Every structure is written in structure tokens, then in C-alpha cells.
Design a protein with these regions (language model features):
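Flexible, glycine-rich beta-alpha linker
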Residues: 1-6
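C-terminal substrate-binding subdomain of Rossmann-fold SDR/epimerase-dehydratase oxidoreductases
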Residues: 14-127
């Protein structure tokens, strides 16, 4: 079970005492979003009556893999990281503009640190 994304895999591997593999230097940036925020945004879209037909479901905030590792360490977890050679297929930075969805969705987003903590607490109960 490799997980469904970097955060999921990093937390599960940390819990199991496995090494987290990071391709490159860990400075690749991604736009992570908490699942509850995705659900709330989708509900906002179901009720949307406007003219736009395309929306980015995103946090509009970039976070690197190194940042994620640091957050796990601040939660007093002990992730063990192995850095592997960078892959040419990995984009350095992916951050989506969420201005359009936020214009119809007025609920503040869950900060990434809180989302990671929430997921970790939920996962501990499930394992």
C-alpha cells in the first residue's frame, strides 16, 4: 500500500517505521487541500448558478515535501527520509489558482498543518 499521495504515504510510512523516498531535493512544491475543504467546495458548486464552467479545487498555497516532513517532525513524529535522484517527469511547482471557487465559497480553508494533524489522528484510529 503506497498511499494515495505524498502526505498519505509519508504519514503511513512514518507510523510503520519505513523510509520515505523523496525524488530530488524535496523542494518540489504542490498545492495540497484538505478533504473537508474539497467537499465544501463541491457543495458550493452544486448550488452555483453563474456563468463559469471551470473551477480549480485547490488551496492556492504551495507546500514543499521538505515542509511536509518538517510538519511531521513538529508533531513529534520521526520520519526517516531517503533522497533519490530527481526525475525529469516531476514538475518543480504546481499551485492552482482558486480565485474563482473562492468567489462563491466563503468558508476559510483548513490550514495544511491542521489538516495533516487531523488526518494523522484519524489514521491512528483506523490502523
Amino acid at each position: 500500500n503506497k498511499g494515495v499521495g505524498f502526505i498519505d504515504a509519508a504519514i503511513k510510512k512514518t507510523i510503520r517505521g519505513e523510509k520515505i523516498e523523496i525524488w530530488g531535493d524535496g523542494n518540489n512544491v504542490r498545492d495540497y487541500i484538505y478533504i473537508d475543504d474539497v467537499c465544501r467546495m463541491l457543495i458550493s458548486l452544486f448550488n452555483y448558478q453563474g456563468n463559469y464552467d471551470t473551477f480549480n479545487i485547490s488551496s492556492n498555497t504551495g507546500t514543499s515535501q521538505r515542509d511536509i516532513i518538517r510538519m511531521l517532525e513538529e508533531m513529534h513524529l520521526a520520519p526517516e527520509v531517503v533522497y533519490l535522484p530527481a526525475r525529469s517527469v516531476d514538475a518543480k511547482k504546481i499551485i492552482l489558482n482558486n480565485e474563482r471557487i473562492m468567489s462563491i465559497h466563503e468558508v476559510p480553508l483548513v490550514p495544511i498543518v491542521q489538516g495533516i494533524e487531523n488526518y494523522y489522528q484519524w489514521l491512528k484510529k483506523e490502523i
